[in-house]
Amino acid sequence: MTPPVATDAAFSHSSNGVVLSTSVDPSGTVLVIGSMTSAQSGAYQKAVEAYSGRQVEMHMVDRLTDGATSLSANTYPLAHLAVNYAEAASPVLLSSLHSALQPKAKLIVEAAELVDASTAQKVKAELIIAGFTDIQVDVATGSVSASKPATASSSFSIGSSSGSSSALPLRRKLGSGASANAKKSLWATQPASANDLIDEASLLRDADFVATTAVKRPDCDVGAGQGKKKKACKGCTCGLRELQEEEKRTANTNIVQLDTDDMDMPNADTPATTKRTEVIETIIGKDGKPKTIKRIQVDTKGATSSCGSCFLGDAFRCSSCPYLGLPAFEPGQKVEIPVGMDDDI
């Protein structure tokens, strides 16, 4: 069947009054793209009939987006899309159309649906990305029109499924050989040779080998060589002074001194000949409750035992010796037992 001859009248307007460009080839083939929805509603057939005086090439949108059909490059002076805006905004479809249209060609989208602000901006953005210019949105008719630039260099299409595109290639800027080698050595995980290893000693300064000394506060009166036990400063705020005062108070009060009567020594002196002093005191325990303790001071001078070696230490004491567990002492020395050794005292 011979296609109808193109006329200027058929090319000057579309079915719903959209004025078309007459600067393109009036005898070229018009590309009409439809969908299943537009075919069922009759919009696809109506768009084809609008160009009855021209040669029309018809395609379904899903065939183009799926890559089943390819379009010839720089062939069509006009493309008419009878699809909805979701299908028309497909980057694959718009890129393919941009490659297939001639310079200064016209693209018309008739979705037969209302165009709101968000939909129009989305379609317009996709058309700009694909490389189209002179984009116009007709809210009353629900149509969008755009043009392909006169020169291919003004397009920055993202590519098409047919493999032919007028998009500008993105070329990687090659650096010099020295910069490439420097970058390669920067990301290298292994040194090129053993000479590249850094001597750790070279990273140290002379001052790093000198032992550091602690910083001393100006009001601290604790000097070096005063013994292992630390003395609290004059203005102590760390609690050391309170701990030392508590230790001193406990050492002076929580002591029980044995009498010779408690020593169970067969040859020990009788109480009449032994000096004995008893002191009863009330102290506050760690649990906050008052406790009554008895301090007994006994002069062990002249005290003897069956073995006579109790003062030498546990190695010379029998199992019933009252001095068992105490350090060695001199004969006649006061024997003191801390309260902490027996909770019942």
Swiss-Prot record:
Record-annotated membrane-spanning stretches: none
UniProt-listed InterPro entries: Anamorsin (IPR007785), CIAPIN1 (IPR046408), Dre2_N (IPR031838), SAM-dependent_MTases_sf (IPR029063)
Residues spanning the signal sequence: none
Entry cofactors: [2Fe-2S] cluster; [4Fe-4S] cluster
Superkingdom in the source lineage: Eukaryota
GO BP field: iron-sulfur cluster assembly
SS bond partners: none
Region span, Disordered: 147-166
Residues annotated to bind [2Fe-2S] cluster: C220, C233, C236, C238
Residue ranges annotated as motif Cx2C motif 1: 307-310
Subcellular location: Cytoplasm; Mitochondrion intermembrane space
Chain positions recorded as [4Fe-4S] cluster binding sites: C307, C310, C318, C321
Keywords of this entry: 2Fe-2S, 4Fe-4S, Cytoplasm, Iron, Iron-sulfur, Metal-binding, Mitochondrion
Linker: annotated span: 167-210
Position of sequence motif Cx2C motif 2: 318-321
Listed Pfam families: CIAPIN1, DRE2_N
Region (Fe-S binding site B), start-end ranges: 307-321
Region (N-terminal SAM-like domain): 11-166
Molecular function as annotated in GO: 2 iron, 2 sulfur cluster binding; 4 iron, 4 sulfur cluster binding; electron transfer activity; metal ion binding
Gene Ontology cellular component terms for the protein in this record: cytoplasm; mitochondrial intermembrane space
Function per UniProt: Component of the cytosolic iron-sulfur (Fe-S) protein assembly (CIA) machinery required for the maturation of extramitochondrial Fe-S proteins. Part of an electron transfer chain functioning in an early step of cytosolic Fe-S biogenesis, facilitating the de novo assembly of a [4Fe-4S] cluster on the scaffold complex CFD1-NBP35. Electrons are transferred to DRE2 from NADPH via the FAD- and FMN-containing protein TAH18.
Domain commentary: The C-terminal domain binds 2 Fe-S clusters but is otherwise mostly in an intrinsically disordered conformation.
Name of the molecule in the record: Fe-S cluster assembly protein DRE2
Source species: Mycosarcoma maydis (Corn smut fungus)
